[in-house]
Amino acid sequence: GCALVGGEMAEHPGVMAPADYDLAGFTVGVVDRPKMLDPANVRPGDVILGLPSTGVHSNGYSLVRKVIGVDGIKPGTPEAAAKAEELSRPLEELGGASLADALLAPTRIYVKPILELLRGGAPVHAIAHITGGGITENLNRALADDVDAVVTRNGAEMGWDVPPVITYVSRQAELAPNEACKTFNMGVGLCL
């Protein structure tokens, strides 16, 4: 007797056959209204903290599949075996990791560190999970209507490192920097 509302329908073009099924899981949280974070509390001068991602997380995989050339390859064929071998080779651009390993890095889950911050009384005004659309499209969900954010990345000294797998796929896809920022998390999985 529980309505599961919201969310999205997963699409798997070129991945799943008609008889295949997708098993997914999710969690739902409950919070007392006085403890809810409210974007209205975000004010000019607040600092945005970005928590690092482990790679592409769960977004941009349609583009990734095009870049790595796996669309249309039937599982169990010699072509599939050759592609698997190719994707398993270490790449210098990925610090010696294979593209397969870099793309399959598990999505970082932020629950524990966020709960520690909140329970410790840290003044967190809002949180934005950086998913499809990147920082460009997701940060606005955590801002008051009358507040804008300015995010700059000036390299590791004053910003953060973009995971090599994101740089690699963006370059292979010939994405302009602004398009890469709208497709991938660019190394930031969560903003506070």
Feature map (PLM): residue ranges:
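Glycine-rich anion-binding loops of enzyme active sites
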Residues: 1-62
